[in-house]
């Protein structure tokens, strides 16, 4: 997939994993690239080094096994010539079943490869507005400067740009105890029972509580959701109170000095809501109005709802339960939820500083802003989460842009691959778009002809299919 020298110039803004990967892949395809990085003249509050591709938090690139979605993504990146994976493998350190790197040597290797490439020129200056040059890739990361973020917001609409993420956990469908839950959207949409308020009062043994003012909005949300019913995990009063107490008492992740997270009232961490009062959640995301447990014919005291994460409903997210609890605490507390006692968590919840756009609303198939042709986004600003995913997004943005510049039909990786799954996530419309690590829910499910497989076996078959399809796609290029 390498090409001859090209007259096209591409500007890449940001020298992190996504920007470096994008610049390298474009240069490998014969394009002259100008990579603009503001260090050493200015650093984000998280940065301490002047090198490119600085890993500011963990040195781990997470699990290596192919039965792990990120492990599959790493293997795919190796097979397509990723610079980040090559440097990671060269600078790896012992980490059990994970791929971890010596972060100093890794950054040195990435910087050396970029600076030595004959078709890449590195400029050190700050970019405070979207450059006039086209095409341009913005890969400015989660701590994009206020000035550049303001320029982007002015171009796409402030409502489509977020300054921190609020991620709820995701559980696998296979791990839900379906004997304890039921499917129904509020007021009977997609479920069994619809009734007026008087009928609901007759069906429940608990006193009627005033409905919150957002009921009308939730009715609209349910109508827009079509026939896709939520999964409802019911609580009695004792279970609810114990759950709230556990949320309040749980250990939380301390905000890093550079984050300065300011919560929006409409997207508070669940433990913050719980701390405001015992009934806050019961009048918020856990309110049971419009829901009837078919096993009892009554409305539960409280309900935690799960929403499908993918079309095949192989995974569900915990609606409204974005959290800053430590991961071990999330496992302990969320397994108190009826039906989730043995839940497998595909993604843990988090809340942290993160500048990103509403990718499904804004980006076209080449990761290009529909409102600004020639402006492409890569990395965390597009809505991926994690080192490996950022490098993957840089790779994808580069190869799609290269195809576009050559007037070739776009040839994205198949949706059966992890690389294709990154694009699936960026294009999948959600009620509230949030960044995500790669999960199996982003990858096309197996054909039903495979029959019922145990979880690990299913993932292994999906990985085999992914690598087979990836190799065929890559060879055809």
UniProtKB/Swiss-Prot annotation:
SUPFAM superfamilies: FAD/NAD(P)-binding domain (SSF51905). Residues 190-224 are annotated as: Disordered. The keyword tRNA processing applies. Pfam families: GIDA. GO terms for cellular component: cytosol. The keyword Amino-acid biosynthesis does not apply. This is Methylenetetrahydrofolate--tRNA-(uracil-5-)-methyltransferase TrmFO.
